[in-house]
Amino acid sequence: MRRHLSLLIGSLVLGLSLLIAPAASWAYPFWAQQNYDSPREATGKIVCANCHLAKKLTQAEVPQSVLPDTVFTASVKIPYEEGLLEIGADGSDVGLQVGAVVMLPDGFTLAPQDRWTEEMKEETEGVYFSQYSDDQPNILLVGPIPGDQHQEVVFPLLSPDPATDSNIHFGKYQLHVGGNRGRGQVYPTGEKSNNAVYTAPASGSVAAIEDGDNGSSILTINTADGAAVTETIPVGPQLLVNVGDNVEAGAALTNDPNVGGFGQVDAEIVLQNPVRIYGLLAFFAAVALAQIMLVLKKRQIEKVQAAEGNF
């Protein structure tokens, strides 16, 4: 029930935002929530890639190991050229928004805010974290947020404690991270956005280019068998063809306005047993002590040999 309520609220926020600020450049993680039970498919692909078709670099920084019940941070870097603009929903130039998803191992969660350090609070200022669903607290979402301020997103995380949860075990675990900058090329409904390349639906000659609603263009192609095929191109992409041009089916009718993209990366983290660390420290101490004793013994023998005149 809570998930449906959160999705309803998200939809209302989306609708209001489009009415109030139609030129904004969004990267909505909750669209994935509405269409997929998990953000990661069986193939390993994160579902954001189904709408954001361009591949871009995403980096993740996580500690090599953590102790139980410990607050730590994971950093997701979503780099792009500073000052870069893209096509908004109304065809205007807008700044890029970014979003991120972090799939943690079972038991790992967002750290309670009362355990955040002052540094964590500063690093996460202006960032809102949400769970993918009520029953998946280990899957965290961020975005959309302004990319010019957040090309690095820091997640304050809490490691589980096997002493209080029998389902958790010490060992190595995988994290799955996705980062997106800019708008998608395809909506979850399957329709193209105005941030995509539009292609010819059929081979033929461009017979007409007419103005449509909301700044769109309606392009008519006459095929060899006399049929007239139309393609509506929304405001934003620039036409590459003129009336009288011959085009092949699948040929680009517009430029590619997209400057963003999505990337994913896997990382590993070890939930370390503190007893093993103490044992390792004790082993190192024993080795160091043994080396010291050997050195002292050697010096003692050398002194005895020197006293006996046996060099």
UniProtKB/Swiss-Prot annotation:
Keyword Transcription: no
Parts of the chain that traverse the membrane: 277-297
Cofactor: heme
Signal sequence, start to end: 1-27
Quaternary organization: The 4 large subunits of the cytochrome b6-f complex are cytochrome b6, subunit IV (17 kDa polypeptide, PetD), cytochrome f and the Rieske protein, while the 4 small subunits are PetG, PetL, PetM and PetN. The complex functions as a dimer.
Keywords: Electron transport, Heme, Iron, Membrane, Metal-binding, Photosynthesis, Signal, Thylakoid, Transmembrane, Transmembrane helix, Transport
Cellular-component GO terms for this entry: plasma membrane-derived thylakoid membrane
Residues binding heme, per UniProt: Y28, C48, C51, H52
Family: Belongs to the cytochrome f family.
Function: Component of the cytochrome b6-f complex, which mediates electron transfer between photosystem II (PSII) and photosystem I (PSI), cyclic electron flow around PSI, and state transitions.
Name of the featured protein: Cytochrome f
Membrane topology: Single-pass membrane protein
Organism from which the protein derives: Parasynechococcus marenigrum (strain WH8102)
Gene assigned in the entry: petA
GO biological process: photosynthesis
Subcellular location: Cellular thylakoid membrane
Superkingdom field: Bacteria
Cross-referenced PANTHER family: CYTOCHROME F (PTHR33288:SF10), PTHR33288
GO molecular function terms listed in the Swiss-Prot or TrEMBL record: electron transfer activity; heme binding; iron ion binding
HAMAP family per record: Cytb6_f_cytF (MF_00610)
Co-factor binding comment: Binds 1 heme group covalently.
The UniProt record lists the keyword Heme: yes
